[in-house]
Amino acid sequence: MRVFTLAPLALLPLVLARPSQRSSSPQKPIMADNGDLVMIPEGHEKSNLDEIIASSELLSLHRSLSEIESISNNEGSVGDFLVEYLERHGFTVQKQAVPLDGHEVDEEERKPSRFNVYAYPASSPSPEIILTSHIDTVPPYIPYSLSLPPTASTGSSSIDRRAIHISGRGTVDAKASVACQIIATLSHLESNPDTPLGLLFVVSEETGGQGMHHFSNSPLNTSPPTFHTVIFGEPTESKLVSGHKGMLHFDVHVRGKPAHSGYPWLGRSAVSEILPILSKVDSLGDIPESEGGLPSSEKYGKTTLNIGVMEGGVATNVVPASASARVAVRLAGGTVTHAKETILAAVRSASKNPEDVHVSFSAGGAYPPVDLDSDVEGFDVMTVNYGTDVPNWDIHDHDLPDHGKVKRYLYGPGSIFVAHGENEGLSVGDMEDAVEGYARLIRAAVGRSERK
């Protein structure tokens, strides 16, 4: 294992550039002022913001990751960067080829176009604690940029460096988690080199979780588990997540009979048939379960539905011969089977011509609410409504007693509210706080290792 000297975790937030040796330069050096305040000469804001990022191992790693476009199916370049970075810092790295979404594995291809990255210190080939996140992003690519909110200025020549805002696609979801997990791991290993830590960075989380499914079905997912803790990274506002809603997708297809719109009684309108069905479906989260609605729970609230896509008809002067809709369900309780039965019953009750209506559920990706561990002190705790890769990793601990089951934590910097938007971004302070949060989770997991 190569020796790597990393600034102690406590020093990571404030690794500032050294003063320039060129006394003739009109630009004053960046200087620490009262902890997180930094002197910025007027007119040099951009260059000095860049310098602050470059002077921090955490922030420069995050910038390098975010500057590489890695929209789902195009994660190869960011994977190559991670492999080189982790090997340079003493990790043994395995690349796990993952076929592109909708494609088969090309066995003849020597270099996979994309791959999961699985890494561990040479001294610990069987990690007991694994930190994981994803390296793909949603489209479109938005370049990395830095800005200084007006509230960050504390005077004519100083700013609060923690308030520096970092923007761009993936800066939050989830390259912030990736960078913070790596730095927290390196910092822990610097003083505890024998800790059995591992890192797993997967592709395709945003498009169905093929990367995590691929890892889950591989020999690396040991049975029974050789690991006892998994720390998942997603934007959680640096709060510990005690669980998230389940997920179910389905399509409604309606067949009609075309006719001239001047004589609609000669046909059957598929649109007129699907509208009351969708109205009924859309209300299932607000109907009590005892009256045919979908379940709610104290922990997750109501089940919610989103009719995301509707299609029907070909022209205004033609009675529509077909109509369809695609619906996403965020389950707050119950089982997937029960939810499907409830949806089918609602569709039947709202159909005038049930024989013309067909409901199809997505073959994969359906799961009930996911409960997670939140037993580490020092965190605010919340639930979230979005889906993650957690259910895509089938951990083989189902037959183990409760005290032997794998702990699963979900934590990370940034907010889901901006994660897929044009305003995706977070602050330097968010990043630095998350490194300490991951470090705290690692320390708690190490305590379990020592009690084994």
Curated annotation (Swiss-Prot):
Its EC number is 3.4.17.-. The keyword Secreted applies. GO terms for cellular component: extracellular region. It is found in: Secreted. It is an enzyme of class 3 (hydrolase). Its cofactor is Zn(2+). Zn(2+) 2 binds at residue 173. The active site is at residue 205. GO terms for molecular function: metal ion binding; peptidase activity. Its main location: secreted. GO terms for biological process: proteolysis. Keywords: Hydrolase, Metal-binding, Protease, Secreted, Signal, Zinc. Residues 1-17 form the signal peptide. Zn(2+) 1 binds at residues 173, 206. Binds 2 Zn(2+) ions per subunit. InterPro entries: Bact_exopeptidase_dim_dom, Peptidase_M20, Peptidase_M20_dimer, Peptidase_M20A. Belongs to the peptidase M20A family. PANTHER family: ACETYLORNITHINE DEACETYLASE, PEPTIDASE M20 DIMERISATION DOMAIN-CONTAINING PROTEIN. This is Probable carboxypeptidase CPSG_08841. The lineage of its organism: Eukaryota, Fungi, Dikarya, Ascomycota, Pezizomycotina.
